């Protein structure tokens, strides 16, 4: 690797550390010509599948779009940044392990919804409302009821639909 300071071609690795998630290696290097030290990050480069949009056009996968979808769904929600990043990584991982050269955008949306469902139920319903083009309150109610049916039963678990109805009544009253 060329030294970023003097452009000399010979550098040596003096330390290597694997990141917490095991996906990146940080290498500390030293230039043999000028003695300057610098760090490099090494990751495996796997080609992600192309995304086939609903109109049939194809585009390269863009992780920023996935992140933007999470950000919109979770706006003003108390979800930790590291949890959102982990969810984005999970979507990317699902695409990588699919082994497909092309993936329909609808499948990416489903991956995002599955991660949101685990992360934040309100964010999940927000995303689902746009993704599935909800047209009225009945669509929201149906999705919330489906979500409640799938939740593990617990006396501590709040009833989503009941909470929504109670909030609606408070705002009207």
Curated annotation (Swiss-Prot):
**Which residue numbers delimit the ATP-cone domain?**
49-139
The UniProt entry's GO biological process terms, in alphabetical order, are: negative regulation of DNA-templated transcription
Which PROSITE patterns does the protein's record reference?
ATP_CONE
UniProt keywords, alphabetically: ATP-binding, DNA-binding, Metal-binding, Nucleotide-binding, Repressor, Transcription, Transcription regulation, Zinc, Zinc-finger
Q: How is the cofactor bound?
A: Binds 1 zinc ion.
Q: Which Pfam families does this one have?
A: ATP-cone (PF03477), Zn_ribbon_NrdR (PF22811)
Name the cofactor(s). Answer: Zn(2+)
Record GO terms (molecular function): ATP binding; DNA binding; zinc ion binding
UniProt cross-references to InterPro entries, sorted A to Z:
ATP-cone_dom, NrdR-like_N, RNR_NrdR-like
Q: Where are the zinc fingers (unnamed)?
A: 3-34
Family to which the UniProt record says this protein belongs: Belongs to the NrdR family.
- Function text: Negatively regulates transcription of bacterial ribonucleotide reductase nrd genes and operons by binding to NrdR-boxes.
**What's the protein name?**
Transcriptional repressor NrdR
């Amino acid at each position: 690797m060329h030294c970023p300071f003097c452009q000399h071609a010979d550098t040596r690795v003096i330390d290597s550390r694997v990141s917490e998630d095991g996906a990146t290696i940080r290498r500390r290097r030293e230039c043999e010509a000028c003695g300057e030290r610098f760090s490099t990050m090494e990751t495996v480069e796997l080609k992600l599948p192309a995304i086939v949009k609903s109109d049939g056009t194809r585009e390269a996968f863009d992780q920023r779009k996935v992140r933007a979808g999470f950000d919109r769904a979770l706006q003003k929600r108390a979800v930790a940044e590291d949890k959102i990043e982990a969810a984005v990584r999970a979507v990317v991982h699902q695409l990588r392990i699919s082994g497909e050269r092309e993936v329909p955008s609808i499948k990416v949306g489903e991956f995002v919804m599955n991660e949101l469902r685990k992360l934040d139920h309100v964010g999940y319903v927000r995303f689902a409302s746009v993704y599935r083009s909800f047209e009225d309150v009945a669509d929201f109610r149906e999705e919330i009821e489906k979500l409640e049916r799938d939740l593990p039963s617990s006396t501590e678990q709040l009833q989503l639909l009941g909470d929504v109805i109670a909030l609606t009544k408070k705002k009207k009253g």
